[in-house]
Amino acid sequence: MFIVVEGIDGCGKSTVASLLAAEIGKKRPVFHTFEPGHVRDGLYRELIMENVDNPFVVAALFTIDRAEHVKKMIKPALAKGEWVVCERYADSTLAYQGYGMGLDKELINRMNEEAIDGLWPDKIFYLDIEPHLALARLQNKEKDALEGQGLEFLQRVREGYEEIARTRGYIYMDATLPPEIIVKRILEEVKLQ
């Protein structure tokens, strides 16, 4: 089972994914991962932050990172029978660089198709939250250049996620709920036995 947790910055992806992986790990092998930067210890993330004002460079770096991530980490984990819980995947690039920054969405889709090599998640859980609430959560957190884009940017990204969700069959989760409740609902959806 390949599970992805998506949502705008400040929605609680990392907290939910960590708790989810811990719960799954009680019953079966699980691999908890994230994008970007899990493959090369943040090399791409550093390059991305240096080029944050160029959506094409950012999208290209994300998809290069994703291609390595899929090939070297996600597919091998799935082949071993592990469940994979991933924070962000292909749709993050579409939402952030396509809807948020205005890069051509078809170009991003083509890049993602190559990067993921046909591997789509079994379930995508979208942690939905109003952008102003997400920004309030990020107040005390050190923000990177993408997280510091502001309210209007996050509104565009959220609108993008909502449009993507209609075609991809996301399972909506109210990100204002306690993380433990969200995880319980996700576990019900994936029917962990």
Curated annotation (Swiss-Prot):
Primary enzyme class: transferase
Ranges in coiled-coil conformation: none
GO CC annotation: cytosol
Catalysed transformations (reactions): dTMP + ATP = dTDP + ADP
Record's keyword terms, sorted: ATP-binding, Kinase, Nucleotide biosynthesis, Nucleotide-binding, Transferase
A biological process from GO: dUDP biosynthetic process
UniProt: ATP binding residues: G7, I8, D9, G10, C11, G12, K13, S14
An example molecular function term from Gene Ontology annotations: dTMP kinase activity
Pfam families the record matches: Thymidylate_kin
PROSITE patterns hit by this protein: THYMIDYLATE_KINASE (PS01331)
CDD domains xref list: TMPK (cd01672)
The EC number(s) this enzyme carries: 2.7.4.9
Top-level division of the source organism's lineage: Bacteria
UniProt cross-references to HAMAP family, sorted A to Z: Thymidylate_kinase (MF_00165)
Function: Phosphorylation of dTMP to form dTDP in both de novo and salvage pathways of dTTP synthesis.
NCBIfam families cross-referenced by the UniProt entry: DTMP_kinase (TIGR00041)
Protein family per UniProt: Belongs to the thymidylate kinase family.
The protein's name in its UniProt record: Thymidylate kinase
Organism of origin: Coprothermobacter proteolyticus (strain ATCC 35245 / DSM 5265 / OCM 4 / BT)
